[in-house]
Amino acid sequence: MAADGVDERSPLLSASHSGNVTPTAPPYLQESSPRAELPPPYTAIASPGTSGIPVINCRVCQSLINLDGKLHQHVVKCTVCNEATPIKTPPTGKKYVRCPCNCLLICKDTSRRIGCPRPNCRRIINLGPVMLISEEQPAQPALPIQPEGTRVVCGHCGNTFLWMELRFNTLAKCPHCKKISSVGSALPRRRCCAYVTIGMICIFIAVGLTVGTQDFSRRFHATYVSWAIAYLLGLICLIRACYWGAIRVSYPEHGFA
């Protein structure tokens, strides 16, 4: 199959070609490091009825994959583990990356992060400087990947977007609906309580000034200005409290991958 039009965040093998078997992510690979994929060289094996069948080894389970009639594709699917293995070099400016869950992804050469689209994985993969691993060179152990983002479910539209802050209780703008929401509920709750408290204090001060300076205000009309300022500050604080109390909250889909 051609990989030129494949989305960078989707698996290279779509569900329409995978039959009724859905690839799963083995839990024991969670600490593995993503690696760049080079197409392994395919070889020919002899069989009694043919002169030679081109085959390659699966990069996941090492089973033999028959390439007969598939040499025009960029990747092929293993019939044993249902994972993809590249047989051609990626398009210009692209590279293959295999997620620790064994999902084969394609992304730009300059990409630093990529998200795994599998529902049971959803890792945020920090590519960094990726070393190309040839078929003859065994994979070297790598340091654990430091999390640099998390997936957040928008409180307005319900879509998931990548939030690169390492702390919650901040405001975020959804790239899908372009609306502002709070990542976590602690920030709007604290600010709502703070504005309600300040607003009520200003209102009480304004009422006290109004009652206590009735006679004084008849002689000095500038006293009305202090009344107006106190009432206005209290009203502004209460309006801000209503804003923070009604703001939508977006929650992280799960902890850091």
UniProtKB/Swiss-Prot annotation:
The modification Phosphoserine is found at S33. The modification Phosphothreonine is found at T22. It catalyses: a 1,2-diacyl-sn-glycero-3-phospho-(1D-myo-inositol-4,5-bisphosphate) + H2O = a 1,2-diacyl-sn-glycero-3-phospho-(1D-myo-inositol-5-phosphate) + phosphate. Residues 1-43 are annotated as: Disordered. It comes from Mus musculus (Mouse). Residues 1-10 have a biased composition (Basic and acidic residues). This is Type 2 phosphatidylinositol 4,5-bisphosphate 4-phosphatase. The gene is Pip4p2. One of its GO terms (molecular function) is phosphatidylinositol-4,5-bisphosphate 4-phosphatase activity. A motif (CX5R motif) lies at residues 107-113. Its EC number is 3.1.3.78. InterPro entries: PtdIns-P2-Ptase. It is an enzyme of class 3 (hydrolase).
